[in-house]
Amino acid sequence: MAGVGSAVRRLYLSVYNWAVFFGWAQVLYYAVTTLLESGHEAVYAAVERPLQFAQTAAFLEILHGLVGLVRSPVSATLPQIGSRLFLTWGILWSFPETHSHILVTSLVISWSITEIIRYSFFGMKEAFGFAPSWLLWLRYSTFMVLYPTGISSEVGLIYIALPYMKASEKYCLRMPNKWNFSFDFFYASILSLAIYVPGSPHMFTYMLAQRKKALAKAKAA
């Protein structure tokens, strides 16, 4: 029974990783072709649906960690996926005024290259039991460029959206109300920007440690 359970787990994770891989491949293809043909102003409209699918599907990774399907710590997975879902739905989908900015292009290209590498790496490991050394190197090295460009784009887009949040009062809950609770999306977004200050260096340091560990293990093997 344990063998059957392991096979089902590997099949599920393989299908999951490759499905999301193809989602991100779509995002990158549409982003690059639209950028070259129509300019950065048209990129978001071209990638919106596959971007929403691929990024929202990542929510399952939190559940995978919680139920023990994967060994990735939820403490590392949750903030990264949470921030990306916030950008995907709370910023880009909620505030169309951001769509024509060049940072949308740098964001989706940074995200998509990162995730194409990551999901193909884990997809190969689940499907075949191994990943080639060059893919391992890409998995644990490209973040040194793509993480800063992605984070800078995230921070920039949140900042750009702030005036539109304040003017529209979207997602705000004012008192009095039956819950006796108030919420202001504008100030919550400012708080999220403040969290990036310690959070981004912490995540980058964590990924550097993971890189050192993974490449040393591969070299020893």
UniProtKB/Swiss-Prot annotation:
Any one biological process term the GO annotation gives: very long-chain fatty acid biosynthetic process
Q: Which GO terms describe its cellular component?
A: endoplasmic reticulum membrane
Please list the residues that make up the active site.
Answer: Y147, E154
Q: What is catalysed by this protein?
A: a very-long-chain (3R)-3-hydroxyacyl-CoA = a very-long-chain (2E)-enoyl-CoA + H2O
For membrane topology, the record states: Multi-pass membrane protein
In the Enzyme Commission scheme, what number(s) does this protein have? 4.2.1.134
Q: Which GO terms describe its molecular function?
A: 3-hydroxyacyl-CoA dehydratase activity; very-long-chain (3R)-3-hydroxyacyl-CoA dehydratase activity
User: Pfam families in the record, alphabetically?
Assistant: PTPLA (PF04387)
Pathway where it operates: Lipid metabolism; fatty acid biosynthesis
Which residues face the membrane's Lumenal side? 33-51, 96-100, 166-184
- Topology Cytoplasmic: residue spans: 1-11, 71-76, 122-141, 210-221
The record ties this protein, via InterPro entries, to: Tyr_Pase-like_PTPLA
TM region(s), chain numbering: 12-32, 52-70, 77-95, 101-121, 142-165, 185-209
Give UniProt keywords alphabetically. Developmental protein, Endoplasmic reticulum, Fatty acid biosynthesis, Fatty acid metabolism, Lipid biosynthesis, Lipid metabolism, Lyase, Membrane, Transmembrane, Transmembrane helix
Q: Where in the cell is it found?
A: Endoplasmic reticulum membrane
Which family, according to the similarity comment? Belongs to the very long-chain fatty acids dehydratase HACD family.
Q: What is this protein for, i.e. what is its function?
A: Catalyzes the third of the four reactions of the long-chain fatty acids elongation cycle. This endoplasmic reticulum-bound enzymatic process, allows the addition of two carbons to the chain of long- and very long-chain fatty acids/VLCFAs per cycle. This enzyme catalyzes the dehydration of the 3-hydroxyacyl-CoA intermediate into trans-2,3-enoyl-CoA, within each cycle of fatty acid elongation. Thereby, it participates in the production of VLCFAs of different chain lengths that are involved in multiple biological processes as precursors of membrane lipids and lipid mediators.
**Protein name as it appears in the record:** Very-long-chain (3R)-3-hydroxyacyl-CoA dehydratase PASTICCINO 2A
Organism whose genome encodes this protein? Oryza sativa subsp. japonica
User: Encoded by which gene?
Assistant: PAS2A
